[in-house]
A protein has these predicted regions:
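Mid-to-C-terminal Rossmann-like scaffold of FAD/NAD(P)H-dependent oxidoreductases
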Residues: 2-6, 12, 25, 289-388
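Catalytic nucleophile loop
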Residues: 13-16, 158-161, 317
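FAD-binding core/adjacent interface of flavoenzyme oxidoreductases
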Residues: 1-10, 64-153, 229-237, 247-249, ...
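Residue-level detector of alpha-helix initiation sites
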Residues: 14, 39, 112-114, 137, ...
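FAD-site-proximal beta/loop scaffold in flavoenzymes
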Residues: 125-149, 221, 225-228, 240-315
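A Rossmann-like FAD-binding core segment of flavoenzymes
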Residues: 29-31, 71, 77-94, 101, ...
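C-terminal catalytic lobe of FAD-dependent flavoproteins
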Residues: 6, 239-265, 340-420
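Beta1-alpha1 glycine-rich phosphate/pyrophosphate-binding loop at the start
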Residues: 2-76, 167-188, 389
Length: 425
């Protein structure tokens, strides 16, 4: 490959770091510039709501790579570099402050940002004790607000909200979770798993309120701290919930503004194909900022997960280096709450049957999601071996018998064998 060709990677999260390193490994011979908009060296984000927030992991353990790894790979890492504009015609990236960089190929790994709370009480700006969680600094700010006896109100009962709730309980805080939907984790899992996790949190002393709409914040004077969250409950009654700290986890917005301003095709994310290529032949994109057409599910999807970021980054690197290998990986996710590990593969949306295998009481089980008898997704709690078998089986579109699937006396491996393998057995 031409040693004069320059690859510029915008975004130094999981996708950006993986893409830069993979491009070098797959033969990119020219300069590689990795631009991160934070002052911190690239770091793992999942622990921010878990071990790092709970004080069980130090900042020094968060790094995605040692600094020497970038130097060894000949990657120039530039921190605190925020991109203002992309000129596709000139192949130039302009940073805030006016510095310009020429690229031969460009990778957009811009990630996402928290969806902001928009209710009365926010007009004077973000209160000092109201937090979002996306960065290391965000996690540090939350940890500083959470102490034994403080009352923490978590707005949002998704992954982030429940993980923050679990970590806050470990730190001794009194925690209330407010979820607008009728159940927690409503966007990502089925009724049974939602009920299980609500029970887990309530058993740990968390007050979980579902079907609740936040109607406003009460502040200590104009521009002061939040002292209460006002809500409308499922019965239509208005309530005032005192709060020492508020953490908002109501979703994420993809950072697509640079791509959109540059004229790239977008649709709730930067549109990429199975090689992570965009509508511009000289630009790829990977991670939370993208959408792609899923072969497995037959629709356009946007995934917010580290595994997807890594798989897309590797596909992008291969494409850039003339070694295309399409990304056809199964979507999967994980969440650590208390002593439980939830692993999820596939997308359960649209399922018409949920089969439980294992012991809910013993907190080691799987929820298999079927649509028309065909396996489309699985959630596993403290059942890693069953999870891996099911994850591998998802691309096979297996038709499964629900009764057999629920019967733990029947080996799962025999049920999930592809038809050809089953015939040989």
């Amino acid at each position: 490959m031409d040693t004069a060709s320059t690859l510029v990677v915008i975004g130094a999260g999981h996708a950006g770091v993986e893409l830069a390193l993979a491009a070098r490994q797959q033969g990119w011979a020219g300069p590689i510039l990795l631009l991160g908009d934070e002052a911190h060296e690239p770091y793992h984000r999942p622990p921010l709501s878990k071990a790092f927030l709970a004080g069980a992991a130090a900042a020094a353990t968060l790094g995605l790579r040692e600094r020497a790894a970038y130097e060894k790979a000949g990657i120039t890492l530039r921190l605190g570099a925020r991109v203002a504009q992309i000129d596709r015609a000139a192949h130039v990236v302009t940073l805030e402050g006016g510095v310009t960089m020429h690229y031969t190929k460009l990778a957009l790994c811009t990630g996402g940002r928290p969806r902001l709370l928009d209710v009365p009480g926010m007009e004077a700006g973000q209160p000092a004790n109201l937090h979002y969680l996306r960065t290391q600094n965000d996690s540090l700010a939350i940890a500083a607000s959470v102490r034994p006896g403080t009352h923490v109100v978590v707005i949002g009962g998704g992954y982030v909200g429940l993980e923050v709730a679990a970590s806050s309980r470990k730190l001794g805080a009194d925690v209330t979770v407010l979820e607008m939907q009728p159940r927690v984790l409503a966007r990502v899992t089925g009724d049974a798993m939602s009920a299980f996790y609500q029970g887990v949190h309530e058993g740990a002393g968390v007050c979980v309120r579902t079907g609740v709409a936040v109607t406003g914040l009460e502040r200590d004077g104009a521009g002061g701290k939040v002292i209460a969250v006002r809500v409308k409950n499922a019965q239509g009654e208005h309530e005032r919930l005192p709060a020492d700290a508020v953490v908002v986890g109501v979703g994420m917005l993809p950072n697509i503004e640079l791509a959109e301003a540059a004229g790239l095709a977008v649709d709730r994310g930067i549109i990429v194909d199975e090689h992570a290529a965009t509508s511009d032949p000289d630009i790829v994109a990977a991670g939370d900022c993208t959408v792609h057409d899923s072969v497995l599910y037959g629709r356009r999807i946007r995934l917010e997960s580290v595994p997807n970021a890594l798989e897309q980054a590797r596909a992008a690197a291969g494409w850039l280096c003339g070694k295309p290998k399409p990304n056809q990986s199964v979507p999967w996710f994980w969440s650590d709450q208390y002593e439980l590990t939830l692993q999820m593969a596939g997308l359960s949306e649209g399922h018409d049957q949920c089969v439980i295998r294992g012991s809910v009481q013993a907190r080691s089980f799987c929820a298999f999601y079927l649509k028309g008898g065909v396996l489309i997704a699985v959630d596993a709690v403290n059942a890693p071996m069953d999870f891996m078998q099911a994850k591998r089986a998802l691309p096979e579109h297996l038709a499964l018998d629900a009764a057999a699937l629920a019967d733990t006396l029947i080996p799962l491996k025999s049920l999930l064998a592809p038809p050809a393998a089953a015939a040989l057995a």
